[in-house]
């Protein structure tokens, strides 16, 4: 499997405060596809995103309880749904626990 990450998403408890820190405090720039619901920041070779912790837990199909969900996700992007299935199968074979089966996402992609 190719060593690459496309997106690191941080689940934040205070979205406005976090946005202020990253955008105003650090001076990082939000991309044009950011909104008042999610912020994307282009880094060197990947994107960092800020997303409400409760919604990130729901998207990952896990309980929001911080003892089970630490509040971040890593995205490994591929081109087709079949490739997503293969990557998830590979991860499970390597010992990962699949919490959300691959499916069409509300934002238009395919993820698991």
Ranges and model annotations:
Residues 21, 82-89:
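Short amphipathic alpha-helices within nucleic acid-binding modules
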């Amino acid at each position: 499997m190719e060593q690459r990450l496309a997106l690191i998403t941080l689940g934040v408890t205070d979205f406005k405060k976090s946005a202020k820190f990253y955008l105003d405090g650090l001076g990082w720039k939000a991309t044009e596809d950011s909104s008042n619901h999610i912020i994307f920041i282009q880094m060197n070779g990947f994107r960092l995103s800020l997303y409400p912790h409760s919604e990130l837990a729901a998207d990952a199909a896990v309980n929001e309880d911080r003892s089970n969900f630490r509040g971040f996700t890593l995205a490994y992007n591929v081109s087709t749904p079949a490739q997503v299935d293969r990557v998830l199968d590979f991860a499970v074979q390597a010992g990962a626990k699949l919490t959300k089966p691959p499916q069409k996402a509300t934002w238009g992609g395919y993820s698991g």
